[in-house]
Design a protein with these regions (language model features):
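Cytosolic-side transmembrane-helix boundaries in multi-pass membrane proteins
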Residues: 1-24, 28, 218, 222-225, ...
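Membrane-interfacial amphipathic/re-entrant helices at transmembrane-helix boundaries
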Residues: 2-60, 95-110
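Single transmembrane alpha-helix segments in multi-pass membrane proteins
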Residues: 31-35, 39-93, 128-135, 272-282, ...
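Inter-helical junctions in multi-pass inner-membrane proteins, predominant
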Residues: 37-51, 153, 197, 203, ...
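Alpha-helical transmembrane segments within multi-pass membrane transporters and channels
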Residues: 94-145, 287-288
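Helix-loop-helix "hairpin" substructures at the membrane interface of multi-pass membrane proteins
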Residues: 107-115, 122-126, 178-252
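Transmembrane helix-bundle core of multi-pass membrane transporters
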Residues: 133, 137-200, 226-229, 247-258, ...
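Transmembrane alpha-helical segments in multi-pass inner-membrane proteins
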Residues: 238, 248-314
Length: 332
């Protein structure tokens, strides 16, 4: 009986330790919700989940990289580049300051396909550099981050792009059975990722590489091809998120989505995706993104200066990764 109590006590302590950040953030959110009833209002929650939807898609893209002990620091800049491209392709005809005055406005579906295809090429470059040139993902994607930002600056001249077609922007405002289309898109993406991670050979290979890359290669896993697919898929998600962000904002600039990669990495880590590889789930990523976004909105309701918000976010990232490393060392 005493042994059972000790075991249960250890299990509870371990659970609290592993989920300390989530519990702390939820507690802060609850307190803010009690102090400010508008926090849990329908309008605020809808806006929150719209933001979560876009962040979730980016985090899902990065999750595959993290599970294979990699990373993708080009996420934010690539999403911003995608947003700028989407805005250029979706600008209304005859708009003042139109990027390409003689270009017809493209259909929304064509805009998405074209932007995602361009991002896929960038993801292919990342995958090739990481898998074949053996460059550390951190360095490879950091370099690509700067390359993409530079291309975006040269291409747009640093000029904000707006005057978008209503068919394109309505994607962010339309609803299906009362639920915003953005949320439906994120749900469809999440279901596809869950199936990919849990029911396909690619998912099994991905977790095997994250657990022990050398052993996976000996077992016959094509490590190079798997990693390339992961980085291509990640970039496609950044492209999709960039298009949705452009539709939601009604425009874009070179600074759109800046820093989103750090938020996504933090959300993944909070949601149980291990930076040491081999561990991570699609629902866990959703929990991480939701908790992280709730914290940011709660800080805004508390009238915390935006400068201090960055400090809090940075501390959360450090603590989340530290806890993840601690769990990894405990297993060893």
């Amino acid at each position: 009986m005493e042994a059972t109590k000790k075991l249960n006590g250890k299990a509870v302590t371990k659970w609290l330790s592993n989920n300390a950040i989530i519990m702390m953030m939820l507690a802060i959110t609850l307190i803010v919700g009690i102090m400010h009833p508008n926090f849990f209002s329908g309008t605020n929650m809808i806006n929150l989940f719209k933001n979560v939807s876009i962040r979730y898609i980016i985090a899902l893209g990065i999750s595959g990289c993290l599970i294979t002990t990699g990373n993708d620091l080009s996420a934010g800049r690539l999403a911003g580049f995608a947003a700028c491209l989407a805005c250029i392709f979706a600008q209304t005809e005859g708009a003042s300051g139109k990027f390409y005055p003689n270009m017809h406005t493209m259909p929304t579906l064509v805009v998405f396909i074209l932007v995602i295809a361009i991002c896929a090429i960038i993801g292919l470059c990342n995958g090739l550099v990481v898998s074949y040139l053996k460059v550390q993902p951190f360095i490879a994607t950091l370099g690509m981050q700067q390359v993409v930002y530079g291309i975006c600056l040269v291409y747009t001249g640093g000029t904000p792009i707006g005057s978008l077609n209503k068919n394109f922007t309505s994607l962010a405002s339309n609803t299906i059975i009362g639920i915003p289309v953005l949320i439906w898109i994120a749900l469809v993406v999440a279901v596809c990722f869950w199936f990919l991670y849990n029911k396909t050979r690619h998912g099994k290979y991905m977790y095997a590489i994250g657990g022990n890359e050398a052993a996976a290669e000996v077992a016959g896993v094509n490590v190079h091809a798997t990693k390339i697919r992961i980085y291509i898929l990640a970039s496609c998600m950044f492209g999709l998120a960039g298009c949705l962000l452009a539709a939601k904002s009604g425009g874009a600039s070179v600074n759109t989505a800046m820093g989103y990669e750090l938020d996504a990495i933090a959300a993944c880590t909070i949601g149980g995706v291990s930076t040491t590889g081999g561990v991570g789930t699609v629902p866990g990523v959703l929990v991480g993104v939701l908790v992280f976004e709730l914290m940011k909105v709660a800080l805004q309701f508390m009238n915390v200066n935006s400068s201090y918000t960055y400090i809090v976010q940075g501390l959360v990232i450090i603590v989340a990764v530290a806890i993840d490393i601690r769990k990894y060392l405990a297993k060893k």
